Regions:
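N-terminal interaction/assembly modules
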Residues: 1-129
Length: 129
């Protein structure tokens, strides 16, 4: 059984793939050699099912950044984090943001951690208010 951290990391790779291939969440998940853990599948399906709304939130709360111009890894992480904030109310805001920042620092650009933190904090202020 994967930890939530591992599930988020796996979901990041799959959400990146989802966009790169232009496939649905179910198509990406079906291509895996073994079924993912439940939380990974929840995140990937959540991002796939709510992508338009997630991108609307990201566009609304990002200052001077069009969603399509964000680095692809950041975009995938932000969609996952925004999904968790909006559809997983039992998760503490700090955990969602911290996990996304750690993954951004590990897999994206030098400035991504700060960007991901600031944007998810703005979204959390609205979604969890």
């Amino acid at each position: 059984m994967a930890t939530r951290r591992e599930a988020r990391e796996r979901a990041l790779a799959l959400c990146y793939e989802l966009e790169a291939k232009g496939e649905t969440a179910d198509e990406v998940l079906a291509e895996l050699p073994a079924p993912p853990d439940a939380y990974t599948a929840t995140l990937v399906r959540g991002v796939g099912d709510h992508r338009v709304e997630l991108d609307r939130w990201l566009g609304k709360y990002s200052e001077r950044w069009a969603v399509e111009r964000m680095p692809a890894v950041d975009r995938a992480l932000l969609r996952i984090g925004t999904y968790e904030l909006g559809w997983q109310p039992e998760l503490p805001v700090g955990v969602v943001i911290d996990e996304a920042v750690e993954l951004a620092q590990q897999y994206s650009t030098q400035d991504s951690g700060r960007f991901v933190h600031a944007l998810l904090a703005r979204i959390a202020d609205q979604v969890r208010a």
